[in-house]
């Protein structure tokens, strides 16, 4: 099964895709938020280009598992996505994926605009790869 991983943000959203076997995640693009309609049009177009069969959205939680403002924004995004697609949508709990991706990219020598261009994609890769590493029995659609 092919999955599309999403690191949702109100300004930029990172997108990753799995291989067709659903075992490895790869960065695909960063979608910059302009209008909601354009954002969803671009996201759905990426899903079609990739022939995705499901979405995996990172759900940021605090250490103790409680929601934050960002968690609520992601949940709202997921509800809007589900109204626009027939594909299943999965939530993957995550903590600090964007910060960890940024640290890794800085260690690789990226900074400034070069870093900004790919950090959200790398966070999406982390989210999707974590999901792909789960046993299928632990994957439940939102």
Swiss-Prot record:
* CDD domains linked: YqgF
Query: What SUPFAM superfamilies does the database record attribute to this sequence?
Result: Ribonuclease H-like
Keyword Secreted attached:
no
Membrane-crossing segments per the record: none
Q: What is its EC number?
A: 3.1.-.-
Q: Which GO terms describe its biological process?
A: rRNA 5'-end processing
Q: Which Pfam families match?
A: RuvX
Name the InterPro entries for this protein.
RNaseH-like_sf (IPR012337), YqgF (IPR005227), YqgF/RNaseH-like_dom (IPR006641), YqgF/RNaseH-like_dom_sf (IPR037027)
A molecular-function term among this protein's GO annotations: nuclease activity
RNA-binding in keyword set: no
Where is the protein localized?
Cytoplasm
* HAMAP family for the chain: Nuclease_YqgF
Family of this protein: Belongs to the YqgF nuclease family.
Instruction: Briefly state the protein's biological role.
Output: Could be a nuclease involved in processing of the 5'-end of pre-16S rRNA.
Name this polypeptide is given = Putative pre-16S rRNA nuclease
Gene source species: Nitratidesulfovibrio vulgaris (strain DSM 19637 / Miyazaki F)
Q: Upper taxonomic classification of the species?
A: Bacteria, Pseudomonadati, Thermodesulfobacteriota, Desulfovibrionia, Desulfovibrionales
